[in-house]
From Swiss-Prot:
It is an enzyme of class 1 (oxidoreductase). This is UDP-N-acetylenolpyruvoylglucosamine reductase. InterPro entries: FAD-bd_PCMH, FAD-bd_PCMH-like_sf, FAD-bd_PCMH_sub1, FAD-bd_PCMH_sub2, MurB, MurB_C, MurB_C_sf, Oxid_FAD_bind_N. GO terms for biological process: cell division; cell wall organization; peptidoglycan biosynthetic process; regulation of cell shape. It catalyses: UDP-N-acetyl-alpha-D-muramate + NADP(+) = UDP-N-acetyl-3-O-(1-carboxyvinyl)-alpha-D-glucosamine + NADPH + H(+). SUPFAM superfamilies: FAD-binding/transporter-associated domain-like, Uridine diphospho-N-Acetylenolpyruvylglucosamine reductase, MurB, C-terminal domain. The lineage of its organism: Bacteria, Bacillati, Bacillota, Bacilli, Lactobacillales. Belongs to the MurB family. It comes from Streptococcus equi subsp. equi (strain 4047). The gene is murB. Residues 23-188 form the FAD-binding PCMH-type domain. Its main location: cytoplasm. Pathway: Cell wall biogenesis; peptidoglycan biosynthesis.
Length: 295
């Protein structure tokens, strides 16, 4: 227990595989769950003052944590998950579940968030990655965000300043951490919104291996191609390294089928990149983030 942070939920040497969608990942020195912005500021101030590294993990849905884990503080926003409506503006804290947030919009007959109805992860991670699917993306509805700078200061970032691109935002370079975000929605027909969300969720169940642990879509879509098709054309569907396999259902996914490790994921990703480039001349770029230390 760290005396200066008494009262905050902090767990020492906690295995991160219990918190990641891939079910892989070594220990964090300190895993912290702040309940509010004050506790978050206390953690960051303490870490910065004592020169201890810190990072925010989010919901760890499009992420691989290496088997050696992460040094310093890993902060999770599970308890910072409030969702509020002000007219047609929806504001959500960074730890709010993305799928559950789309249900709030649906309940109030607000349209614009349907594309995200089946995307796993948190609001903070969705903004960070400019998450998207089926023609929609966060950039289309984003208004502004409150962020925590690496120095521990809170500031506001506009949609223009966020400089969204394909699976990209400026905070991937600046190191700013989303605390909350506002989205501009529109009044819609409740039945139409429900039908569209049901349609998209049906497509996901048909095409994606949702029954297995995975990190979601592994590669960005290369211009003029589909990553999954390139992987299939290279005869890699079902290819396995250790306990991790290229999904037979959707080659753009890698699934943990037999107690796989982060190293299995990394080795399989590297093999797929090499083989696809040799077969097609196209070099795939990972969409998934890989962090932490190797064993």
């Amino acid at each position: 227990m760290i005396a200066e942070l008494e009262g905050i939920d902090i767990r020492e040497n906690e295995a991160l595989k219990h918190y990641t969608y891939t079910q892989v990942g070594g220990p964090a020195d300190f895993l912290a769950f702040p309940r509010n912005h004050y506790e978050l500021s206390r953690i960051v101030d303490y870490a910065n003052h004592n020169h201890i590294p810190w990072m925010v993990l989010g919901n760890a849905s499009n992420l691989i944590v290496r088997d050696g884990g992460i040094r310093g503080f890993v902060i999770m926003f599970d308890k910072l998950n409030a969702v509020r409506l002000n007219g047609y503006t929806l504001e959500a804290e960074a730890g709010a579940n993305l799928i559950e947030t789309t249900k709030v919009a649906k309940f109030h007959s607000l349209t614009g968030f349907e594309f995200a109805c089946g995307i796993p992860g948190s609001i903070g991670g969705a903004v960070f990655m400019n998450a998207g699917a089926y023609g929609g993306e966060i950039a289309h509805i984003f208004l502004s965000a409150k962020v925590l700078t690496p120095e521990g200061k809170i500031k506001k970032i506009s949609a223009r300043e966020m400089a969204f691109g394909y699976r990209h935002s400026v905070i991937q370079e600046t190191g700013d951490i989303v605390i909350s975000a506002k989205f501009a929605l529109k009044p819609g027909n409740h039945d139409s919104i429900c039908q569209e969300m049901n349609r998209l969720n049906h497509l996901r169940k048909l095409k994606q291996p949702l029954e297995f642990p995975s990190c979601g879509s592994v590669f960005k879509r290369p211009p003029g191609h589909f990553a999954g098709q390139l992987i299939m054309d290279a005869n890699l569907k079902g290819h396995r390294v250790g306990g991790v396999e290229v999904s037979k259902k959707h080659a753009g996914f890698m699934i943990n089928v037999a107690d796989g490790s982060a190293k299995d994921y990394e080795d399989l990703i590297a093999h797929v990149i090499r083989t696809v480039e040799q077969a097609s001349g196209v070099r795939l770029e990972p969409e998934v983030r890989i962090i932490g230390e190797s064993l």
